[in-house]
């Protein structure tokens, strides 16, 4: 379970980063 939870957090953080990058590109 701890590993699965950790992976989920990492994936969530990655998705958040992609959203920020996408918005940054759109702003440009």
From Swiss-Prot:
Moderately thermostable. Has a 1.5 hour half-life at 55 degrees Celsius. Disulfide bonds: none annotated. The keyword DNA damage does not apply. One of its GO terms (biological process) is lignin catabolic process. Gene3D superfamilies: FAD/NAD(P)-binding domain. Its cofactor is FAD. Its EC number is 1.1.3.-. Keywords: FAD, Flavoprotein, Lignin degradation, Oxidoreductase. Coiled coil: none annotated. It is an enzyme of class 1 (oxidoreductase). InterPro entries: FAD/NAD-bd_sf. GO terms for molecular function: oxidoreductase activity. Plays a central role in the biodegradation of lignin. Oxidizes veratryl alcohol to veratraldehyde reducing O(2) to H(2)O(2). Primary aromatic alcohols with methoxy substituents in position four are good substrates for VAO. This is Veratryl alcohol oxidase.
